[in-house]
């Protein structure tokens, strides 16, 4: 049976859609970050503010860079990476090798968030990077990729 022009276009379109789905070429947008008056939890943001302020001052990172990483896209910024490292050191959850002690980190968050953080951390155990700042960034980008909806950077 010969297909007319319209039939060929429809068949070709269906074939392209099927191939896209099968090959993974159809990219779905990442989950949008959850942001409202209750998330990120105001109590955590209040607790984190002194550490945040100290690390902004020490590293010179911009609030815009922090917000973009937290709410937008993963990006590389040396000052941001060092802010992340500073924050880990300020809350005393990282050792001198740049390894985050997850049990200490879990203890710093309320029970209501602990399960999310534990789930987010499953594949984020062995940091890569040549410096402490790069290792800190590795953890954060790993967590953000694992759960972009709930990840936030205070």
Curated annotation (Swiss-Prot):
**Keyword Ion transport listed:** no
Where is this chain primarily localised? secreted
Origin superkingdom: Eukaryota
Output a single Gene Ontology CC term carried by this record.
extracellular space
Signal sequence interval, chain numbering: 1-33
* Gene Ontology BP terms: sensory perception of chemical stimulus; sensory perception of smell
Compartmental location = Secreted
Disulphide bridges: 55-86, 82-133, 124-142
Designated name of the protein: General odorant-binding protein 83a
Source organism of the structure: Drosophila melanogaster
């Amino acid at each position: 049976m010969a297909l007319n022009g319209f039939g060929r276009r429809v068949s070709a379109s269906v074939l392209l859609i099927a191939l896209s789905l099968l090959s993974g070429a159809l990219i779905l947008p990442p989950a949008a970050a959850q942001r409202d008056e209750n998330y990120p939890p105001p109590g955590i943001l209040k607790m984190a503010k002194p550490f945040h302020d100290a690390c902004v001052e020490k590293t010179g990172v911009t609030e815009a860079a922090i917000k973009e990483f937290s709410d937008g896209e993963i990006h590389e910024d040396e000052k941001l990476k060092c802010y992340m490292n500073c924050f880990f050191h300020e809350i005393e959850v990282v050792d001198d090798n740049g390894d985050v002690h997850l049990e200490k980190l879990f203890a710093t968050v309320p029970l209501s968030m602990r399960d999310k953080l534990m789930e987010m951390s499953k594949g984020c155990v062995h940091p890569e990077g040549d410096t402490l700042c790069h290792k800190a960034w590795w953890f954060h980008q790993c967590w953000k990729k694992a759960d972009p909806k709930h990840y936030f950077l205070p």
